[in-house]
């Protein structure tokens, strides 16, 4: 496959949804350190944002390595297979390798919801309102 023009194509990282996802993740990490356990939000909020935060970075890396032929939004198959692989590794392989890791099926639901948010955003919405502030 032919790599993108330049060593990194950062089109996916310029998308407002990626910035919002990173902000949700980071703000929650700081908030989580200051607050008591608040149930589902405390335990699964960051799992929800895992795919929207990580997949654009991974796909940009694939492009830089010449493993991805286009720089457009992630396809449904890319979202599904990366989410499935991540869920399998984090919830089934991780607990076998690390004593502190715990398999939690609610995490799988959070990964799936995050994948659905990604798919919905990149295939059914425009978010033009936010694109003005995040243009490069």
Which residues does each predicted region cover?
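Bulky hydrophobic segments
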Residues: 1-136
């Amino acid at each position: 496959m032919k790599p993108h023009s330049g060593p990194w194509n950062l089109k996916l990282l310029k998308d407002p949804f990626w910035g919002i996802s990173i902000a949700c993740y980071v703000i929650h990490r700081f908030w989580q350190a200051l607050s008591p356990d608040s149930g589902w939000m405390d335990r699964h909020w960051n799992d929800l944002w895992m795919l929207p935060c990580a997949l654009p970075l991974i796909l940009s890396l694939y492009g830089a390595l010449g493993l991805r032929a286009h720089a457009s939004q992630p396809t449904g198959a890319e979202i599904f297979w990366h989410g499935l692989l991540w869920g399998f590794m984090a919830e089934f392989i991780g607990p076998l390798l690390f004593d502190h890791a715990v398999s939690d099926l609610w995490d799988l639901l959070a990964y799936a919801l995050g994948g659905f948010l990604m798919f919905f955003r990149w295939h059914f919405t425009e978010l033009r309102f936010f694109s003005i502030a995040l243009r490069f």
